[in-house]
């Protein structure tokens, strides 16, 4: 994906953010085009999670511009709500409602926000639960599911809002090792469907498989951005080389 005839679906220009006196993002520039999959990696505290949380205004940037699907994220509440309706997000923790069944977790948003009838919302939810390979869990409560199953419910719940963009913030980091593959397999299926995705992850095998663009962050800056073949075989920056040597040796 080196040539693009359309405008980017996500554009960050000179984005900076502080937590108090600590600058967590430093003049970040990033473009993502429709259908692209971008993997963001880097050491702990490099600003990865803050970067993607700014894309649906879970965090507010102080300088620069963020435009998502043609809408600038500014102080306008209508703009923020419109972007949030286009952007799904999956976190480290599953954030499912424990008192609702799997099906109810998935239908709540479409009914409350998108105005779907219960019948239509349930049909949509079952379609996505099938897609993440757990339709048989629909009547169960989250507490009875494994971590991998709960994370797949969280992915299905986001997809039920029919977003144009999906953000993943280290979705496998809270899982037991044997459950990681089942979640990554679902994410690979989603990538192959053409969904625009930005994933913060250290799952480098997944990154090699699905990413169009690798982004490496350190100390609040994007240090390197390149296609996976180049990123893994010929990283330009010494800091990237050190990071990869450490993470790929495990």
Predicted region positions:
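Pre-NBD coupling/linker segments of ABC/ABC-like ATPases
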Residues: 2-4, 240
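C-terminal boundary and immediately downstream tail of ABC-type ATPase nucleotide-binding domains
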Residues: 225, 229-250
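ABC family nucleotide-binding domain
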Residues: 7-228
């Amino acid at each position: 994906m080196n040539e693009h005839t359309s405008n980017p679906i996500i554009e960050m220009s000179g984005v900076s953010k502080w937590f108090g006196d600590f600058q967590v993002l430093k003049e970040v520039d990033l473009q993502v085009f429709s259908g692209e999959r971008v993997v963001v990696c880097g050491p702990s505290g490099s600003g990865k999670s803050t970067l993607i949380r700014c894309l649906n205004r879970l965090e507010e940037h102080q300088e620069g511009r963020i435009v998502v699907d043609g809408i600038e994220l500014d102080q306008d509440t209508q703009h923020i709500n419109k972007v949030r309706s286009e952007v799904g997000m999956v976190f480290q923790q599953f954030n499912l409602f424990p008192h609702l069944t799997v099906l109810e977790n998935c239908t709540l948003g479409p009914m409350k926000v998108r105005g779907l009838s219960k019948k239509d919302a349930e049909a949509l939810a079952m379609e996505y639960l099938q897609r993440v390979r757990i339709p048989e869990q629909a009547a169960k409560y989250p507490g009875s599911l494994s971590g991998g199953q709960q994370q797949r419910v969280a992915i299905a719940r986001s997809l039920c809002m029919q977003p144009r963009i999906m953000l993943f913030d280290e979705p496998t980091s809270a899982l037991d090792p044997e459950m990681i593959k089942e979640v990554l397999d679902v994410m690979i299926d989603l990538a192959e469907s053409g969904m625009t995705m930005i994933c913060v992850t250290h799952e480098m095998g997944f990154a090699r498989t699905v990413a169009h663009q690798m982004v490496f962050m350190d100390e609040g800056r994007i240090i390197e951005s390149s296609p996976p073949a180049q990123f893994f075989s010929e990283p330009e920056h010494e800091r990237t080389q050190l990071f990869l040597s450490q993470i790929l040796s495990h």
